[in-house]
């Protein structure tokens, strides 16, 4: 039997957890179809989109283990319409259809579950592992607030003025900062 899996998401931006999910799906299934949620869905979920749908589709298409990327009607905040479309295209005598979720969504309730059960679409939870490797929302938040990772910890620009920046530094236990000399700026430190 030919095995097809449908995955869906905003992928805004794609991160290593998504890549693990795609590779895991490609290892287990003959065909990987990725449904790309709309800009409107991202706005409903996150307030706005980071990348356009065309850019996200271009990135996903370039990932070698994905066979096709599809846009679909997600006005009900689910990918049921995509599943319905793919289900209608396949030969049920020769093909088994699966709906997959990443590791961070394993064994939970989700909008598509009842539809899948009614249509005989099998569910594969936990693709790519069962721990959340990253978050598109965290990536965007860290980028927008200016979080910079360092070997000793990280710093965040809390407030920026024309001639001054206020930074919060988090030094990991057992680590120390490097000594630096600045010719064009002064630093004041408040330690708590």
Where are these regions (language model features)?
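Acidic-residue sensor for enzyme active/binding pockets
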Residues: 112, 168, 187-188
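A generic fold-level signal
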Residues: 134, 161-163, 183
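Short loop/turn microsegments at loop-to-beta-strand junctions
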Residues: 9, 165-166, 186
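Nucleotidyltransferase catalytic core that binds NTPs
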Residues: 1-147
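Histidine- and/or cysteine-centered catalytic micro-motif in compact active-site loops
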Residues: 37-39, 169-174, 182-184
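Glycine- and acidic-residue-biased ligand/ion/polar-headgroup-sensing regions
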Residues: 184-192
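A short, N-terminal "cap"/entry segment at the start of jelly-roll beta-barrel domains
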Residues: 141-178
């Amino acid at each position: 039997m030919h095995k097809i899996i449908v995955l869906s998401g905003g992928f805004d931006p794609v991160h290593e957890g998504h890549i693990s999910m795609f590779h895991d799906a490609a290892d287990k299934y003959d065909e990987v179809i990725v449904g790309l949620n709309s800009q409107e869905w991202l706005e409903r979920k996150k307030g706005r989109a980071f990348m356009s749908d065309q850019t996200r589709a271009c990135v996903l298409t370039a990932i070698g283990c994905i066979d096709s990327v599809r846009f679909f009607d997600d006005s009900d905040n689910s990918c049921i319409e995509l599943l319905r479309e793919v289900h209608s295209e396949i030969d049920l005598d020769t093909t088994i259809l699966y709906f997959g979720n990443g590791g961070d969504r394993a064994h939970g309730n989700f909008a598509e579950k009842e539809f899948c059960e009614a249509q005989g679409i099998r569910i594969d939870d936990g693709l790519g592992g069962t721990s959340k490797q990253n978050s598109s929302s965290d990536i965007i938040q860290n980028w927008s607030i200016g979080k910079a990772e360092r070997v000793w910890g990280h710093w965040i620009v809390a407030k920026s003025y024309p001639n001054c920046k206020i930074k919060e530094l988090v030094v990991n236990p057992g680590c120390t900062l490097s000594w630096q000399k600045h010719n064009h700026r002064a630093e004041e430190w408040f330690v708590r």
